[in-house]
Amino acid sequence: MSMAYLAQPEQQQNLEWLDGGTLAMLLDGKATDGQLMIGRFDVAEGEAPPYHKHTREDEVFLLIKGTALVWCDDQEYELAEGGVVYLPRNIPHGYRITSKRADLLMINTPAGIEGMFRETGRDKSTPRPPGFEVKPDPGLAAKYGNVIVGPPR
């Protein structure tokens, strides 16, 4: 049964992500009865995940602040501040942040992919182990229905 859910900033989990960025987990499947996951990235210039596709969920990116290059099915696009991208499942995609910093909202439906982010990243409320680095893991990605198609672009 679905219920309304309110998550104040202090209730949101913050994960260390690629290249020292932060992923704030705004809503997850537990909060939305599996319907969707919403995360917000604070990342620096050059941050780029591997070129990949999702087999279980559709994805929307809203670039709140900053600029990026986006690749969708091998087509390259420039995404300006305020731009939005819809990525249906099974469409290979990737991005690279081209501004000094970027604020990127990500919505996935249905939920589930947050498990990959939690297993790959590090909860920033815990001590940082010496030498810790977020590294994409193809096996872990596959566990959550993601297929790494190639290196970051």
Question: Which residues are covered by each model-predicted region?
Answer:
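Glycine- and acidic-residue-biased ligand/ion/polar-headgroup-sensing regions
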Residues: 56-58, 62-68, 73
